[in-house]
Amino acid sequence: MPRRRIISTRKILPDPKFSSELLAKFINILMVDGKKSIAEVIVYTALKNLSERTEKKELEAFEIALENVRPTVEVKSRRVGGSTYQVPVEVRPVRRNALAMRWIVDSARKRGDKSMALRLSNELYDAVENKGTSVKKKEEVHKMAEANKAFAHYRW
């Protein structure tokens, strides 16, 4: 618990093309070494490719992909007595989005396609189709929480 005043979360400026705060956050997560314009080009190219493949609007397809990767529960380590338990806890909405975006970007970076825009586009398409590495990561986290359901009463 903080001893000083609680610091409010900073408002993020929406992205210039779609005026979406969610997409702006995604661009910031993708950004490397402060090169935001390059990250924007990569994301917009990937979204354009994605919308062509799914026949949906760019932002709509992005939201569907994000929804399919968002985790609802995760496990946190909790020390009780001499042993550590993996306790399943519900994920807060802000963290849900952050985890989903991070997993999509990490999975895209690990792919072996030619350009980052293509890798990101393919990963987002896989997420829309409910397959791919990022969706597998979400299912893995859910499985872990399900396996440790017995320790749910240790929640804090």
Swiss-Prot record:
CDD domains: uS7_Bacteria
InterPro entries membership: Ribosomal_uS7 (IPR000235), Ribosomal_uS7_bac/org-type (IPR005717), Ribosomal_uS7_CS (IPR020606), Ribosomal_uS7_dom (IPR023798), Ribosomal_uS7_dom_sf (IPR036823)
A GO BP annotation: translation
Keywords linked to the UniProt accession: Ribonucleoprotein, Ribosomal protein, RNA-binding, rRNA-binding, tRNA-binding
GO molecular-function terms, A-Z: rRNA binding; structural constituent of ribosome; tRNA binding
GO cellular component assignments: small ribosomal subunit
Described purpose of this protein according to its UniProt entry: One of the primary rRNA binding proteins, it binds directly to 16S rRNA where it nucleates assembly of the head domain of the 30S subunit. Is located at the subunit interface close to the decoding center, probably blocks exit of the E-site tRNA.
HAMAP family from the UniProt entry: Ribosomal_uS7_B
Family statement: Belongs to the universal ribosomal protein uS7 family.
Assembly and oligomerization: Part of the 30S ribosomal subunit. Contacts proteins S9 and S11.
Cross-referenced PANTHER family: RIBOSOMAL PROTEIN S7
Protein name per Swiss-Prot or TrEMBL: Small ribosomal subunit protein uS7
